[in-house]
């Protein structure tokens, strides 16, 4: 599958897996980002969220996807199932240790004054997330209009240039990989396992 002006590049994954970090890399690499910048940077995402509000209503409204052609948009994994087969997609799917995801979400909630559900609930949520990810991976494999590259959050932090080259190869070898790698700040990696 080649990337062209009609291809929609999607950054996906669970929340708190590095999707905003990947959007930042792709923007630095030269891609056009589809974002409205309504949700601004904060303590939880110091470099911004790169979200597009219309994504939240993807289930009921896909008309905005025409504006995404030739661009990159962030869509959480739960919403991928609502992407119509009438477009071609290149999906950069972010992966991260589930316990780190949960720890990051807990910290985000605490900063907003909401208590964590606790360790027992974290194990249950981890099982739900693992099941969702397995089902999503299986679903993506069956979609001829979608090609997916899986990128590990920790691998990006450990070797940003190597991962930037993988992403560039997947997206057609037209990105500035050095600039992509230069935007990675390992100091923002706060929830480790």
Residue ranges and their predicted role:
Residues 1-69, 183-193:
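PAPS-dependent sulfotransferase catalytic core
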Residues 35-38, 148, 172-183:
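Short, surface-exposed acidic
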Residues 37-39, 55-61, 78, 104-108, ...:
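A generic structural micro-environment signature
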Residues 72-175:
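PAPS-dependent sulfotransferase catalytic domain
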């Amino acid at each position: 599958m080649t990337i062209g002006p009609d291809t929609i590049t999607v950054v996906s994954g669970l929340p708190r897996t590095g999707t905003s970090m990947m959007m930042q890399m792709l923007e630095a690499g030269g891609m056009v980002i589809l974002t409205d910048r309504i949700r601004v940077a904060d303590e939880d995402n110091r470099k911004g969220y790169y979200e597009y509000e219309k994504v939240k209503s993807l289930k009921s409204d896909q008309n905005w996807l025409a504006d995404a052609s030739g661009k990159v948009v962030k869509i959480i994994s739960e919403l991928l199932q609502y992407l119509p087969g009438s477009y071609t997609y290149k999906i950069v799917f972010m992966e991260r240790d589930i316990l780190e995801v949960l720890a990051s979400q807990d910290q985000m909630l605490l900063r907003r004054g909401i208590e964590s559900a606790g360790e027992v609930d974290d194990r249950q949520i981890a099982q739900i997330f693992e099941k969702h990810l397995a089902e999503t991976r299986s679903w993506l494999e069956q979609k001829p209009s979608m090609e997916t590259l899986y990128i590990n959050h920790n691998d990006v932090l450990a070797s940003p240039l190597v991962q930037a080259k993988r992403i560039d190869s997947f997206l057609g070898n037209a990105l500035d990989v050095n600039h992509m790698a230069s935007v990675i700040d390992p100091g923002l990696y706060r929830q480790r396992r």
